[in-house]
Protein backbone atom coordinates (compact mmCIF):
# COMPACT_ATOMS: atom_id res chain seq x y z
CA UNK A 1 0.00 0.00 0.00
CA UNK A 2 2.69 2.50 1.02
CA UNK A 3 5.05 1.65 -1.83
CA UNK A 4 2.24 1.66 -4.38
CA UNK A 5 0.53 4.89 -3.32
CA UNK A 6 3.11 6.76 -1.21
CA UNK A 7 0.35 7.03 1.40
CA UNK A 8 -0.29 5.57 4.83
CA UNK A 9 -3.93 4.68 5.46
CA UNK A 10 -5.19 6.36 8.62
CA UNK A 11 -8.58 6.47 10.23
CA UNK A 12 -9.90 9.87 11.19
CA UNK A 13 -9.33 10.14 14.96
CA UNK A 14 -12.13 10.78 17.40
CA UNK A 15 -11.95 13.95 19.48
CA UNK A 16 -11.76 14.18 23.24
CA UNK A 17 -12.02 17.15 25.58
CA UNK A 18 -10.20 17.25 28.90
CA UNK A 19 -11.20 20.36 30.83
CA UNK A 20 -9.37 21.37 34.00
CA UNK A 21 -10.53 24.43 35.92
CA UNK A 22 -9.20 26.12 39.03
CA UNK A 23 -5.76 26.83 40.45
CA UNK A 24 -3.12 24.14 40.75
CA UNK A 25 -1.64 23.67 44.25
CA UNK A 26 1.94 24.70 45.04
CA UNK A 27 4.62 22.60 43.30
CA UNK A 28 2.03 20.89 41.07
CA UNK A 29 3.23 21.19 37.48
CA UNK A 30 2.04 20.25 34.01
CA UNK A 31 3.84 16.92 34.40
CA UNK A 32 1.81 16.19 37.53
CA UNK A 33 -1.37 17.09 35.65
CA UNK A 34 -0.44 14.68 32.86
CA UNK A 35 0.33 11.82 35.25
CA UNK A 36 -2.87 12.49 37.19
CA UNK A 37 -5.05 12.40 34.07
CA UNK A 38 -3.36 9.24 32.78
CA UNK A 39 -3.79 7.57 36.17
CA UNK A 40 -7.53 8.27 35.93
CA UNK A 41 -8.10 7.37 32.26
CA UNK A 42 -5.46 4.66 31.87
CA UNK A 43 -2.78 4.18 29.24
CA UNK A 44 -5.47 3.25 26.71
CA UNK A 45 -8.01 5.90 27.68
CA UNK A 46 -7.22 8.11 24.72
CA UNK A 47 -6.75 5.42 22.09
CA UNK A 48 -7.97 6.56 18.69
CA UNK A 49 -8.55 10.14 19.89
CA UNK A 50 -7.01 13.55 19.45
CA UNK A 51 -7.21 15.33 22.79
CA UNK A 52 -7.95 19.00 23.38
CA UNK A 53 -6.96 20.32 26.80
CA UNK A 54 -8.87 23.37 28.00
CA UNK A 55 -10.06 25.20 31.10
CA UNK A 56 -8.68 27.94 33.32
CA UNK A 57 -5.90 25.74 34.74
CA UNK A 58 -4.64 25.05 31.23
CA UNK A 59 -4.83 28.70 30.19
CA UNK A 60 -2.70 29.65 33.20
CA UNK A 61 0.10 27.32 32.09
CA UNK A 62 3.18 28.58 30.29
CA UNK A 63 3.77 27.45 26.72
CA UNK A 64 6.43 25.03 27.92
CA UNK A 65 4.04 23.54 30.45
CA UNK A 66 1.46 23.12 27.70
CA UNK A 67 4.05 21.36 25.55
CA UNK A 68 4.74 18.91 28.37
CA UNK A 69 1.04 18.17 28.76
CA UNK A 70 0.45 17.64 25.04
CA UNK A 71 3.61 15.54 24.81
CA UNK A 72 2.26 13.17 27.46
CA UNK A 73 -1.12 12.74 25.74
CA UNK A 74 0.39 9.93 23.68
CA UNK A 75 1.07 8.05 26.92
CA UNK A 76 -2.66 7.51 27.36
CA UNK A 77 -2.94 6.18 23.83
CA UNK A 78 -4.00 9.40 22.08
CA UNK A 79 -2.87 10.32 18.59
CA UNK A 80 -1.87 13.72 19.94
CA UNK A 81 -2.85 16.65 22.11
CA UNK A 82 -3.60 20.30 21.42
CA UNK A 83 -4.48 23.50 23.24
CA UNK A 84 -6.29 26.42 21.65
CA UNK A 85 -3.83 29.27 20.96
CA UNK A 86 -4.20 32.43 23.02
CA UNK A 87 -2.15 35.48 24.03
CA UNK A 88 0.37 33.23 25.79
CA UNK A 89 0.89 31.41 22.50
CA UNK A 90 1.14 34.56 20.43
CA UNK A 91 3.73 36.14 22.74
CA UNK A 92 5.77 32.95 22.78
CA UNK A 93 6.21 32.98 18.99
CA UNK A 94 6.73 36.73 18.67
CA UNK A 95 10.51 36.88 19.11
CA UNK A 96 12.18 33.52 18.26
CA UNK A 97 14.71 33.52 15.44
CA UNK A 98 12.55 31.78 12.86
CA UNK A 99 9.22 33.37 13.79
CA UNK A 100 7.49 35.71 11.30
CA UNK A 101 8.58 39.33 11.68
CA UNK A 102 6.72 42.64 11.61
CA UNK A 103 4.01 42.59 8.91
CA UNK A 104 4.38 38.84 8.38
CA UNK A 105 3.84 38.31 12.11
CA UNK A 106 0.71 40.48 12.11
CA UNK A 107 -0.70 38.63 9.11
CA UNK A 108 0.07 35.29 10.73
CA UNK A 109 -1.48 36.46 13.99
CA UNK A 110 -4.80 37.09 12.29
CA UNK A 111 -4.80 33.53 10.97
CA UNK A 112 -3.77 32.05 14.32
CA UNK A 113 -6.63 33.83 16.07
CA UNK A 114 -9.04 31.89 13.85
CA UNK A 115 -7.81 28.57 15.30
CA UNK A 116 -10.52 28.33 17.94
CA UNK A 117 -12.90 25.66 19.12
CA UNK A 118 -16.56 26.48 18.53
CA UNK A 119 -18.45 27.11 21.79
CA UNK A 120 -20.98 24.43 20.84
CA UNK A 121 -18.39 21.94 19.55
CA UNK A 122 -19.25 18.30 20.18
CA UNK A 123 -16.72 15.73 21.37
CA UNK A 124 -16.83 11.95 21.35
CA UNK A 125 -15.63 11.95 24.97
CA UNK A 126 -15.39 14.65 27.63
CA UNK A 127 -13.68 14.63 31.03
CA UNK A 128 -13.67 17.32 33.70
CA UNK A 129 -11.22 17.73 36.58
CA UNK A 130 -10.70 20.25 39.37
CA UNK A 131 -7.18 21.66 39.50
CA UNK A 132 -7.31 21.80 43.29
CA UNK A 133 -7.72 18.00 43.40
CA UNK A 134 -4.48 17.34 41.52
CA UNK A 135 -1.51 16.54 43.81
CA UNK A 136 2.20 16.13 43.17
CA UNK A 137 2.37 12.79 41.34
CA UNK A 138 4.90 10.00 40.88
CA UNK A 139 4.73 6.63 39.17
CA UNK A 140 5.42 3.50 41.16
CA UNK A 141 4.90 0.87 38.46
CA UNK A 142 5.84 0.03 34.90
CA UNK A 143 3.62 2.31 32.83
CA UNK A 144 2.64 6.00 33.19
CA UNK A 145 -0.86 5.06 34.32
CA UNK A 146 0.48 3.47 37.50
CA UNK A 147 0.90 6.84 39.19
CA UNK A 148 -0.12 7.98 42.66
CA UNK A 149 0.29 11.09 44.83
CA UNK A 150 3.86 11.28 46.11
CA UNK A 151 2.44 11.14 49.65
CA UNK A 152 0.53 7.90 48.96
CA UNK A 153 1.46 4.24 49.32
CA UNK A 154 1.94 1.51 46.74
CA UNK A 155 -1.49 -0.04 45.97
CA UNK A 156 -2.60 -3.39 47.32
CA UNK A 157 -2.27 -6.41 45.04
CA UNK A 158 -5.71 -7.68 46.06
CA UNK A 159 -8.93 -5.72 45.77
CA UNK A 160 -11.66 -5.59 48.41
CA UNK A 161 -13.05 -8.89 47.14
CA UNK A 162 -9.70 -10.64 47.40
CA UNK A 163 -9.11 -10.80 43.65
CA UNK A 164 -5.49 -10.36 42.56
CA UNK A 165 -4.73 -7.47 40.20
CA UNK A 166 -2.25 -9.14 37.85
CA UNK A 167 -0.93 -5.81 36.50
CA UNK A 168 -0.24 -4.47 40.00
CA UNK A 169 1.35 -7.74 41.07
CA UNK A 170 3.69 -7.87 38.06
CA UNK A 171 4.65 -4.21 38.47
CA UNK A 172 5.42 -4.65 42.16
CA UNK A 173 7.62 -7.65 41.45
CA UNK A 174 9.59 -5.84 38.75
CA UNK A 175 9.95 -2.65 40.79
CA UNK A 176 10.87 -4.46 44.00
CA UNK A 177 8.07 -2.74 45.91
CA UNK A 178 5.40 -4.08 48.26
CA UNK A 179 1.75 -3.26 48.91
CA UNK A 180 1.34 -0.39 51.34
CA UNK A 181 4.93 0.79 50.98
CA UNK A 182 5.28 4.57 51.21
CA UNK A 183 6.66 6.37 48.16
CA UNK A 184 7.88 9.32 50.22
CA UNK A 185 11.40 8.54 51.35
CA UNK A 186 11.92 5.83 48.72
CA UNK A 187 15.63 5.46 48.00
CA UNK A 188 16.86 6.45 44.55
CA UNK A 189 20.21 5.79 42.91
CA UNK A 190 19.91 7.96 39.80
CA UNK A 191 18.15 11.17 38.80
CA UNK A 192 17.48 12.21 35.21
CA UNK A 193 16.29 15.66 34.16
CA UNK A 194 15.70 15.89 30.44
CA UNK A 195 13.85 14.37 27.45
CA UNK A 196 11.32 15.87 25.04
CA UNK A 197 8.88 15.94 27.95
CA UNK A 198 10.88 18.02 30.44
CA UNK A 199 14.14 19.16 28.88
CA UNK A 200 13.14 22.78 28.25
CA UNK A 201 14.65 25.95 29.70
CA UNK A 202 11.75 26.37 32.12
CA UNK A 203 12.46 22.90 33.52
CA UNK A 204 16.12 23.73 34.05
CA UNK A 205 15.21 27.02 35.71
CA UNK A 206 12.87 25.27 38.16
CA UNK A 207 15.43 22.60 38.96
CA UNK A 208 18.19 25.19 39.49
CA UNK A 209 15.93 27.32 41.68
CA UNK A 210 15.39 24.44 44.07
CA UNK A 211 18.96 23.09 44.24
CA UNK A 212 20.66 26.50 44.47
CA UNK A 213 22.63 26.72 47.69
CA UNK A 214 22.24 22.99 48.36
CA UNK A 215 24.41 19.95 47.61
CA UNK A 216 23.60 16.83 45.64
CA UNK A 217 23.64 13.63 47.64
CA UNK A 218 26.89 11.72 47.02
CA UNK A 219 24.80 8.55 46.77
CA UNK A 220 22.88 9.74 43.70
CA UNK A 221 24.20 9.92 40.14
CA UNK A 222 22.46 12.74 38.27
CA UNK A 223 22.14 13.41 34.56
CA UNK A 224 20.98 16.92 33.61
CA UNK A 225 20.39 16.92 29.86
CA UNK A 226 18.99 19.96 27.97
CA UNK A 227 16.54 19.12 25.22
CA UNK A 228 18.42 21.02 22.53
CA UNK A 229 21.52 23.12 21.84
CA UNK A 230 19.33 26.20 22.08
CA UNK A 231 18.26 25.24 25.60
CA UNK A 232 21.87 24.50 26.57
CA UNK A 233 23.07 27.90 25.34
CA UNK A 234 20.20 29.68 27.09
CA UNK A 235 20.98 27.87 30.34
CA UNK A 236 24.61 28.91 30.09
CA UNK A 237 23.65 32.50 29.29
CA UNK A 238 21.44 32.62 32.41
CA UNK A 239 24.13 31.12 34.63
CA UNK A 240 22.14 27.97 35.31
CA UNK A 241 25.19 25.85 34.58
CA UNK A 242 27.09 27.64 37.36
CA UNK A 243 24.28 27.11 39.88
CA UNK A 244 24.15 23.42 39.03
CA UNK A 245 27.93 23.03 39.20
CA UNK A 246 28.10 24.59 42.67
CA UNK A 247 25.37 22.19 43.82
CA UNK A 248 27.28 19.17 42.51
CA UNK A 249 25.50 18.78 39.19
CA UNK A 250 26.62 19.38 35.63
CA UNK A 251 24.98 20.02 32.27
CA UNK A 252 25.48 17.28 29.70
CA UNK A 253 25.26 17.59 25.93
CA UNK A 254 21.69 17.69 24.54
CA UNK A 255 20.07 14.46 23.43
CA UNK A 256 17.69 11.68 24.40
CA UNK A 257 20.16 10.30 26.97
CA UNK A 258 18.72 8.20 29.80
CA UNK A 259 15.14 8.50 28.56
CA UNK A 260 15.76 5.34 26.52
CA UNK A 261 19.20 4.27 27.79
CA UNK A 262 21.02 5.90 24.88
CA UNK A 263 24.79 5.41 24.63
CA UNK A 264 26.31 5.05 28.10
CA UNK A 265 23.43 6.75 29.94
CA UNK A 266 21.97 3.56 31.33
CA UNK A 267 20.52 2.78 34.75
CA UNK A 268 22.00 -0.53 36.01
CA UNK A 269 19.81 -3.53 36.78
CA UNK A 270 17.89 -3.21 40.03
CA UNK A 271 18.74 0.47 40.50
CA UNK A 272 16.10 3.17 40.93
CA UNK A 273 15.94 6.36 38.87
CA UNK A 274 13.63 9.31 39.33
CA UNK A 275 13.13 10.65 35.84
CA UNK A 276 11.38 13.55 34.11
CA UNK A 277 10.94 11.51 30.93
CA UNK A 278 7.65 10.13 29.65
CA UNK A 279 7.96 6.34 29.86
CA UNK A 280 8.76 3.92 32.65
CA UNK A 281 8.37 0.59 30.89
CA UNK A 282 10.41 -2.42 31.98
CA UNK A 283 14.00 -1.94 30.80
CA UNK A 284 13.30 1.50 29.35
CA UNK A 285 16.35 3.10 30.99
CA UNK A 286 18.48 -0.03 30.79
CA UNK A 287 17.97 -3.79 31.31
CA UNK A 288 16.39 -4.31 34.71
CA UNK A 289 16.23 -0.57 35.46
CA UNK A 290 13.46 0.76 37.71
CA UNK A 291 11.98 4.15 36.84
CA UNK A 292 9.88 6.61 38.82
CA UNK A 293 8.37 9.29 36.53
CA UNK A 294 8.04 12.72 38.13
CA UNK A 295 8.26 16.45 37.44
CA UNK A 296 11.49 18.48 37.47
CA UNK A 297 10.38 19.99 40.79
CA UNK A 298 9.97 16.56 42.40
CA UNK A 299 13.23 15.35 40.87
CA UNK A 300 15.08 18.31 42.37
CA UNK A 301 13.69 17.67 45.83
Identify the residue ranges that each predicted region occupies.
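Fe-S-dependent hydro-lyases/dehydratases of central metabolism
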Residues: 1-301
